[in-house]
A protein has these predicted regions:
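Conserved core of the PLP fold type I
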Residues: 69-224, 234-236, 242-254, 374-375, ...
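N-terminal "arm"/small-domain region of PLP-dependent enzymes with the aminotransferase-like
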Residues: 2-90, 94-97, 101, 302, ...
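Conserved core segment of the aminotransferase class I/II
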Residues: 5-7, 94, 253-332
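Short beta-strand
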Residues: 44-46, 84, 262, 359-364, ...
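Conserved PLP-binding catalytic core of the aspartate aminotransferase-like
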Residues: 328-385
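Short catalytic/ligand-binding loop motif for oxyanion handling, primarily in non-cytosolic enzymes
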Residues: 53-58, 203-204, 270-271
Length: 427
């Protein structure tokens, strides 16, 4: 039905077509960042968002990245043309080789890869692809997991039931491996997807041992579960990119499991705002790889058309040059090393204060985060001390430095004593 200009309905604030919508909750991490920014206190600490900070509490552009940016800027051949739908070819190959360890030609023929909008885009693309191609009834997600995992699967795979497998043991601040395996053994069904953190688990900082990874792979084979790895922190757990890729490579090397991996370069290259990522699928044969990749490219075209080029150029430039790659690996060691130093410093300060509870888990955990064991009540009390972390107790350790670690430890000591509730017992 058509309208004349005079007959067009006028929508005011009171009768908008969108007034039926409920206001969605804001993201808690970015909300906390806003609270921190508004806090007028001179002494304060933000342990919220998962970004690396240097000893001065400032963003750190990796020296290798700075060097390559200058080289790209001075290259007269640099342009801003569209990339292919699957992304910058040399980047996609470099990302694949970094993750899978320079795979053999026979393995390469079974790996399909394309560039994505960082790790979030890779998880989204994978969720949508698996929803459309495999129609799984359930996806198993660790309890807890990165909060955005839930939202991504809600949007990209709304008909897939999200189930939680036990992961964190609050009594010991350690991995509940027995509970995890028992739940998956008894309740997971053939065809279910299982989401696994490749290393530096977010938010707990607790990873399975290699022997435990082998048992998880055995279970996936036995139960016919489909592994979906999220690799957001390669190089941040141990400081060694090969060591941190061990779980993914072990699953692949068994030769019995098809799987997918979402890969992010935000953390290990410090390219948070450039949104550099990749998605990989490992199939049982080359024909299946080609078919799956064609569907992934089809989805990519409909959603973003082409991924952005700048950050991908930086990563590819570094990974394709042995000298630059070696320099970047040193940058990684600096970042992971400082985080480990800050873990030890916080633990040492709490020990010196004789803060009630066992805090050994802070140094036992790895990667960017610590699941401190602090309760929501204690976390909220910390905000009055101008210390900001998530209500789950997750703390971004890179937010600590030599100037604020004593203040943070004293604040934790204060709220723990005031609450009379020690957050952890001896493991």
């Amino acid at each position: 039905m058509g309208y004349t200009r005079e007959e067009l309905p006028v929508h005011t604030k009171s009768n908008s077509l969108f007034n039926h919508l409920e206001t969605m909750p804001g993201d808690p991490i970015f909300g906390l960042m806003s609270l921190y920014a508004k806090d007028p206190a001179e002494e304060k600490a933000s342990l919220t968002i998962g970004v690396y900070r240097d000893e001065e509490g400032k963003p750190w552009v990796l020296p290798t990245v700075k060097k390559v940016e200058k080289m790209i800027a001075e290259d007269v051949a640099t342009n801003h043309e569209y990339l292919p739908m699957e992304g910058l070819h040399v980047f996609v190959e470099s990302a694949r080789d970094l993750l899978f360890g320079n795979p053999s030609p026979s393995l390469t023929s079974r790996i399909g890869s394309l560039q994505t909008i960082s790790g979030t885009g890779a998880v989204h693309l994978g969720a949508r692809f698996l929803n459309d191609s495999l129609s799984p009834k359930r996806i198993w997600v660790s309890d807890p997991t990165w909060g955005n995992h839930h939202a991504i699967f809600d949007i990209a795979a709304p008909n897939v039931e999200q189930k939680m497998y036990p992961y964190y043991d609050a009594a010991t601040c350690s991995l509940n491996f027995t509970g995890m395996m028992k739940t998956l053994e008894n309740e997971a069904q053939p065809g279910d997807v299982i989401l696994l953190h490749a290393c530096a688990h977010n938010p707990t900082g607790i990873d399975p041992t290699k022997e435990q990874w082998k048992q998880i792979a055995d279970l996936c084979e036995r139960k016919h579960l489909f592994p979906f790895f999220d690799s957001a922190y390669q190089g941040f757990a141990s400081g060694d990119v090969d060591e941190d890729a061990w779980a993914v490579r072990h699953f692949v090397e068994r030769g019995t499991l098809e799987l997918v991996v979402a890969q992010s370069f935000s953390k290990n290259f410090g390219l948070y705002g450039q949104r550099v990522g990749a998605f990989h699928i490992v199939t049982s044969d080359e024909q299946a790889r080609d078919k799956a990749l064609s569907h992934l490219i089809y989805l990519q075209r409909a959603e973003i058309s082409n991924p952005p080029v700048y950050g991908a150029r930086i990563v590819a430039f570094i990974l394709q040059n042995e000298e630059l790659k070696a320099e970047w690996e040193q940058d990684l060691l600096i970042m992971s090393g400082r985080i480990k130093t800050m873990r030890a410093a916080l633990f040492g300060e709490l020990q010196a204060l004789e803060t009630p509870g066992n805090w050994q888990h802070i140094v036992n955990q790895n990667g960017m985060f610590s699941y401190t064991g602090l309760s929501e009540k204690q976390v909220l009390a910390l905000r009055k001390e101008h210390i900001y972390l998530l209500t789950s107790g997750r703390a971004s350790i890179s937010g600590l430095n030599r100037d604020n670690v004593k203040m943070v430890a004293k604040a934790i000591d204060k709220v723990v004593r005031a609450s009379g509730d020690a957050p952890a017992v001896a493991a």
